[in-house]
């Protein structure tokens, strides 16, 4: 099954690095030089890192958001893994509700939803724009201007 090469999470509010680090290490990640790595016996590896957007990124993204973006989380999926890989289950089992999971391995979307639920402020709203099948990364917009239902309908 296809797994996207990565995601970008964008939020209008700063993400607390300590909360990000604590979430990652509590869920089996290894923290090193502001990057978190998860390795699976299947050979799949996920790397996530937190940055402040550059001026150009902020200028590019601001028109889509009600305020300039403050934090960006890049998530890179290094390898493919099948959806029946049991090694994924303990780490990334999480609430998965209304994701548009066409062509995506649902375990990766569960992992991303856990990141959003546990690290970002709960009132931030998700807008998710999947990439073409052969391209990436996907975009996950986090913007309080939209309600959850409106966001999914856009």
Residue positions per predicted region:
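Glycine-rich, often proline-containing surface loops adjacent to acidic residues and nearby aromatics
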Residues: 1-6, 66-78
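Acidic, proline/glycine-rich low-complexity IDRs
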Residues: 1-4, 90-154
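Short, extreme N-terminal segment that most often corresponds to the first beta-strand
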Residues: 1-37, 148-154
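Hydrophobic, Leu/Ile/Phe/Ala-enriched alpha-helical segments that form helix-helix packing faces
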Residues: 20-31, 65, 92-99
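A generic structural motif
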Residues: 31-42, 103-110
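Short, solvent-exposed beta-alpha or beta-beta edge segments that form flexible loop/patches at the rim
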Residues: 39-69
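Conserved aromatic-histidine-acidic binding/catalytic patches
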Residues: 79-83
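Well-ordered, non-membrane alpha-helical segments in soluble/globular domains
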Residues: 84-90
């Amino acid at each position: 099954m296809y797994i996207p090469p990565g995601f970008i999470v964008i939020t209008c509010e700063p993400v607390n690095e300590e909360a990000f680090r604590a979430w990652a290490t509590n869920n089996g990640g290894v923290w090193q030089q502001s990057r978190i790595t998860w390795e699976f016996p299947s050979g799949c590896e996920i790397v996530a890192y937190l940055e402040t957007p550059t001026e150009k990124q902020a200028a590019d993204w601001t028109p889509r958001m009600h305020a300039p973006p403050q934090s960006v989380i890049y998530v890179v999926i290094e390898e493919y893994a099948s959806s029946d890989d049991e090694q994924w289950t303990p780490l990334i089992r999480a609430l998965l509700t209304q994701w548009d999971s066409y062509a995506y391995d649902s375990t990766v979307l569960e992992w991303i939803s856990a990141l959003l639920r546990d690290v970002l402020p709960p009132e931030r709203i998700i807008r998710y724009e999947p990439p073409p099948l052969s391209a990436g990364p996907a975009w996950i917009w986090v913007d309080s201007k939209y309600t959850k239902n409106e966001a999914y309908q856009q």
